[in-house]
Amino acid sequence: MKNRILYRRLETKRYLCSIIQNKMGINKLKVVLTEEAQAFLDAQPFKAQQKIYYNIFKVEEGVMKVDIFKKLENTEIWEFRTLYNGICYRLFSFWDTEEETLVIATHGIVKKTQKTPLKEIAKAEEIRKEYFNNKK
């Protein structure tokens, strides 16, 4: 029930912001979650979900801070970074190169070490490759 309320509030904010931005002629980012990314978010504690969705919303509104949304080195993968109660949540994503304002979130992890696991980056790159192959 709480998830539905949070989602509705987030959608209402997105709708109102999109109306304002359309009137002002501002291009807004759109973040799309894959099923796996959505399942990851749904499995997290409610307060952590709120914080992750809040960070996604901030990026959609154009806040591009490195502590929230960062490009990983030597790759086309980006990560949404959320720290809540000492736990680091990462949501991997990539830009749709045909639509400048579309970001696809592939999957997420709870980060336990300082270094981002290479297998998770490879997984995100594979999903990206699949996405573009299916678009052709």
Residue ranges and their predicted role:
Residues 1-88, 97-102, 111-136:
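Basic, Lys/Arg-enriched alpha-helical interface segments
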Residues 105-106:
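Conserved catalytic cores of phosphodiester-cleaving nucleases, focusing on short active-site segments
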